[in-house]
């Protein structure tokens, strides 16, 4: 008999049944075997008539299953789940492409983003901070606070190097490019504001263990911006901006403190729920980032496409490029003996090169009568996001290698 042939047990006589005519027919017992399995390939699992036949190494194994049981291989189902989780978790890798796509869409069809008004910015940024908090721990933030030298480096990049570069390129805009004074003031205003929450998210995507340090840097610059930003604007632009201290502190709590605290608590006390939602955070974060980039551009599309738009884009590109490079080399010089110098360089670079341009835009619209002052902040939101997340794509590949 062939090794893989199915064996059919012959029915045995369990008794006889007498018909009224006197003839007798044998009464059959329930069959002890079923039809051959659907597949005879090695390692396959098949189901038939309430039994599972598995052919492997020339033998059959039988395991009874219920009629309602799923007939698919558990291994295949599990592999499908793993593949889906990988796809969801890897959504962050397409952020640069999504940012570029949202920029093009905002230029071609502004109504696709104009519905996402400024009132949604705080909840959107808060969600990104929540995603960072879910993937962090209290210990990470304690360790970050214990590095005052790194925090100081980020602060120097934010409020010394960046304002100097802003003043330089703002002056060039007026003296060399002959742009209106309002556009030069707008470039300087961008350099006076605190760090952007998107810098924290960019750091998280590149060096996750550095995200708490980046958050501490941005929180400190945001908290002190209530005093520093008006002072810098007075010296650079000649106009002292009355910043709402209460509103600024409230924004810090809503956008940074509360979402991160919620994420940390969820990670600490509800780990199962945290694990369940973690795979869905990357694609949602990508979507939110696209909205935060496309909306300011779409809302201010007329100013961006003005005759001065291209020159302003070139100047802001040079400003942000110089800021990223200056922050990178600042940390490289400051921490050249540190074991994690490369990670610190990337973190300080993000902190120096990415500003809270949305805050600058709000200040421009509120305190400057000339609408051209708001053009550089609107362009800056898009440029710094494109450049920052392009660096994420490059640096994250290097860290994995």
From Swiss-Prot:
Its main location: membrane. The keyword Plastid applies. Pfam families: SBF. One of its GO terms (cellular component) is membrane. InterPro entries: BilAc:Na_symport/Acr3 (IPR002657), Bilac:Na_transpt (IPR004710), Na+/solute_symporter_sf (IPR038770). Keywords: Chloroplast, Membrane, Plastid, Transit peptide, Transmembrane, Transmembrane helix, Transport. Coiled coil: none annotated. Residues 1-46 form a transit peptide. The chain crosses the membrane at residues 93-113, 122-142, 159-179, 185-205, 215-235, 247-267, 273-293, 299-319, 372-392. It is a multi-pass membrane protein. Belongs to the bile acid:sodium symporter (BASS) (TC 2.A.28) family. May function as sodium-coupled metabolite transporter across the chloroplast envelope. PANTHER family: SODIUM-BILE ACID COTRANSPORTER, SODIUM_METABOLITE COTRANSPORTER BASS6, CHLOROPLASTIC-RELATED. This is Probable sodium/metabolite cotransporter BASS5, chloroplastic. The lineage of its organism: Eukaryota, Viridiplantae, Streptophyta, Embryophyta, Tracheophyta.
């Amino acid at each position: 008999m062939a090794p893989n042939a199915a064996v059919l047990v012959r029915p045995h006589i369990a008794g006889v049944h007498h018909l009224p005519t006197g003839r007798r027919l044998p009464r059959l017992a329930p069959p002890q075997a079923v039809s051959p399995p659907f597949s005879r390939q090695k390692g396959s699992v098949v189901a038939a008539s309430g039994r599972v036949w598995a052919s492997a190494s020339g033998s059959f194994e039988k395991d009874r299953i219920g009629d309602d049981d799923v007939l698919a291989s558990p291994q295949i189902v599990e592999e499908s789940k793993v593949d889906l989780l990988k796809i969801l978790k890897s959504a962050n890798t397409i952020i640069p492409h999504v940012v570029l796509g949202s920029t093009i869409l905002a230029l071609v069809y502004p109504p696709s983003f104009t519905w996402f008004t400024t009132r949604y910015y705080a909840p959107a940024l808060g969600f990104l901070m929540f995603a960072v908090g879910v993937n962090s721990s209290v210990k990470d933030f304690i360790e970050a606070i214990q590095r005052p030298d790194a925090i100081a480096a980020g602060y120097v990049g934010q409020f010394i190097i960046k304002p100097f570069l802003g003043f330089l390129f703002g002056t060039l805009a007026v003296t060399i490019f002959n742009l209106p004074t309002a556009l030069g003031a707008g470039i300087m205003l961008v350099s006076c504001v605190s760090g952007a929450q998107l810098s924290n998210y960019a750091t998280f995507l590149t060096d996750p263990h550095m995200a708490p340090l980046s958050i501490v840097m941005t929180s400190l610059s945001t908290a002190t911006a209530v005093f520093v930003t008006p002072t810098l604007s007075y010296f650079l632009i000649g106009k002292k901006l009355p910043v709402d201290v209460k509103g600024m502190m409230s924004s810090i709590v809503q956008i940074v403190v509360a979402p991160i605290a919620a994420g940390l608590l969820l990670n600490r006390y509800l780990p199962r729920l945290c694990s369940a939602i973690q795979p869905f955070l990357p694609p949602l974060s990508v979507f939110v980032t696209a909205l935060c980039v496309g909306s300011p551009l779409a809302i201010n599309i007329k100013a961006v496409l003005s005759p001065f738009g291209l020159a302003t884009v070139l100047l802001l590109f040079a400003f942000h490029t110089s800021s990223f490079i200056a922050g990178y080399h600042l940390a490289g010089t400051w921490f050249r003996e540190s074991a994690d110098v490369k990670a610190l360089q990337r973190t300080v670079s993000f902190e120096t090169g990415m500003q809270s341009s949305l805050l600058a835009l709000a200040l421009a619209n509120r305190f400057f009568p000339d609408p051209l002052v708001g053009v550089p902040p609107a362009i800056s939101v898009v440029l710094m996001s494109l450049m920052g997340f392009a660096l994420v794509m490059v640096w994250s590949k290097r860290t994995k290698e």
